Structure formats: structure tokens, C-alpha cells
Amino acid sequence: MIRENTIVRVRYTMKNSRGEVLENTSITYLHGSPAISTILQSQLQGLGPGEQKQVLLKKGQEDADDDFTFDIIVDAIREATPEEQKRGAPIPPLKIHLLSGFLGSGKTTAIHQACRLLAKENTIVAVITNDQGSRLVDGELFTHLGIPSRQVINGCFCCNYNDLDAAIHYLLKHNTPGVVFAESVGSCTDLIATVFKPLLQQHPEWQTTASVFADAQLLNDNSVGFDETINYIYAKQLEEAPVIVVSKSDLIDSTNLQKKMRSHYPGKTILYQDSFNEEHIARWLQTLDTIPFTKDLPSLDIDYDTYGAGEAKLAWLDQELRIDSLTNKAQHAALALIETIAQTNSRIGHLKFLLDGHTKISYTAAGATDTQDAKPASAATLLINARIQTDPQTLAEHVKHAIEIIEQQYACAIHTLSESCFQPGYPRPTHRLA
């Protein structure tokens, strides 16, 4: 309920006496502060989330030069922090940080560490994950970590723009975040034209930014080593980036890489980042706050047929397993299964595993990124997100064969609870603003 010292987010349409729409936007404010009209605030007092009200501001009231009608919808309400309760303290605009970058480039790790850092500053943070599939390791991990999150599934942000917009508004209504990280699927590009610019156009009151992540190890090798159409996607991601975050830079000597990046991407902001270093995360967030992100950012010159062909070269498998072991070796079997699946002759985009709903293990094109010790357990669950350069049938058979090997080796029973294996469809963005 709206009362003194609550943070309120409302959407409103403002019309003059002739019925002309002057504003159609949203605002977040401290109720009782001079941030918005005191007459409007008095009329909103006592309303709850989802409630609506029409308020009339008559000519002469608060220096109004006409009769103005406000059709108001209350989106969200929460208690103000002591800092926010300082009368007149401005409530900063919602920050939407878009992240793109190739599979396994370190986006999720950076988001997780940024959430931890911002939580120390009492900033409410939320995350939107995105994938071509429907069972997301990263989405379930953020849920386990207690970070408010939503998922945009079965396609990229650009092809499911309305779902992304709905996810943001859901989080605003239910969690009132100050910052939302939106992580696009790693096989996606052209986000400036299809996501960033539409958000900027439809929600100018938000502070929207865009970062593209790239694994320093892959950049250092000069090629991601995939089919040329997949390499095309990777190159286009970097080409459109206003900010390039070279992640995992602590794993290489980046001297030569920095020279190459300056030569290939002049004029771009390039950060070399170890996302487990809090100072690096703080620098990235500060950079996003200081660089102007405007509609003048160039949209890609991109061949969608080549882009679509590249996505179709990747097979995607989402599978949930339960492992039962009479010898308390369920976790041992799960970890052995992970290693067996990773032993493939096909090029790995990203292998992500979630063990027992909370332990994430990953393999990328550059190799393994996580390790885990097994503990005695009679049962374990394993969620698999596999993105590999092959066809769906070959990938499904590879995983099935790995399961058979581990069942025999560990004398355990592995049950498939859900499974989906497919190739992404042709990218058809909802919007594209050149």
C-alpha cells in the first residue's frame, strides 16, 4: 500500500484538456518527496500494486497552465531504505544492462559477481536469462542463489522481444530492482538493432547499456575454431559491441592480445577482466554508468542467411537426470558422466551442468572452467545444457552412450526425467531498428 516513505513505481498517461497525449511513461519516486506533484501523490495514497486511478490536475494548481488528466497504474511498492528516505533524494532510473557474447564467454560469472557487489551496496538486483531451450542451468542457479530472476526461453531476446519486455515489467512489479542484468543466448548477435534500440525507443526513462563478452583464451588463439558461419556470428558480436569485456584475461599474458584488440577495434571501449576480482567488476559497472549509450550506436550490416546457417550448425540438448546408487556413489557417477560427455570429437560451444540444483560445472571451447569433488550420496540430480557443433541426433546418441558407460561402470541407475534435443530456428527479430 502506498504511504509515506515507500518507493513507488507507476506508469501513467498524461493528457491535456483537448485529449492529446503529452506523456506516456513511468517513474519511480519516494512517496512524500517533491519528486512528483503533491496533488497526484495525495490521490495515490493507499493504493496497492496493480490498482489504477485517474487524477485531474486543474489549471492553476501547482502552476499548471491547462487541465491535465493522468491515467495512473501502480506497478510496484516497497519500503524505502534509510538512504532513500532522505527527502528529495532522487531515485535513479532503472538500469538495464544487456550482455551478449559467445557461448562460454563468462557472462553469467560476471553477472553473479556483479549481483554480489551491488547487494553489498543495498541495490536490489534482478537477472533475466535467455536460451534457445527451455531448461536453463543458469536460470535455476540464480533461483538457488536467491537472486530475483526470469527466463526468456525457446529463442533469443531479438525473436522474443515481447517476452523480454514482459520479464522486465514482472521484475519491476514484484521485486522493484534498481538494476536488471539481461543475458542473451550465446549464439545471438545483432542486439543493438533488435533489442537495445527498441528498449531505448520504448523506454527512454530507463538507462540501457550493452556489453559484449569474449573469452581471452579464444581471442588469443585468433579463432573460435568452429564452422565459418559460426565464426561469422562471433565476429559480428564483437563488431557491434560498444563495450567489449575480455573475460578470463587473468589466464593469459594479454600484452599481445591488447595490441591486437586496439588494432582491430579502434574507438571501442575494451576492458580486460577477471570476473572474480571485485575491482574489475566495479570498473565494468562504473564504465557502463559513464559511457553514453544512445540511439546513434550503429546497427550491424549483417547477412541473416549466414547468421541463421551458423545457429543451425549447433545442436542443443537439455536433459534432466536422476542418478540412484546403492553404493552411495551417485555424485561420483554424475561427475564421471560429465567428464564422459565432455570427451567428444565435436567442437564444444558450451557444456553446462547443474548438480543437485546448486553446483554448476562448465566446459567451453577453451576447456573446463569448474571442478567439483564428489560426496557420498545415494541419489543425485543432473541438469545438462549442451551446445555443440554437430547435429541433434549425434549429440543425443553421444549423451545416451555416455549414460550407458557410467551405469555399467558405477552399477547405478540413471533415469531421464526430461529431454529435448534440437537445432535453433532461423532468427526472425520482432523489431529491427537500423
Predicted regions span which residues?
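Conserved nucleotide-binding/hydrolysis micro-motifs of P-loop NTPases
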Residues: 61, 78, 132-135, 186-189, ...
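Canonical P-loop GTPase G-domain recognition
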Residues: 231, 235, 239-311
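Nucleotide-state-sensitive switch-loop elements of NTP-binding domains
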Residues: 89-100, 105-232
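Short, aromatic/basic amphipathic alpha-helical patches
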Residues: 139-146, 257-263, 398-403
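P-loop NTP-binding site
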Residues: 90-113, 290-434
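FKBP-type peptidyl-prolyl cis-trans isomerases
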Residues: 1-89
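A structural signal for short, well-ordered beta-strand segments
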Residues: 10-12, 70-74, 99, 210, ...
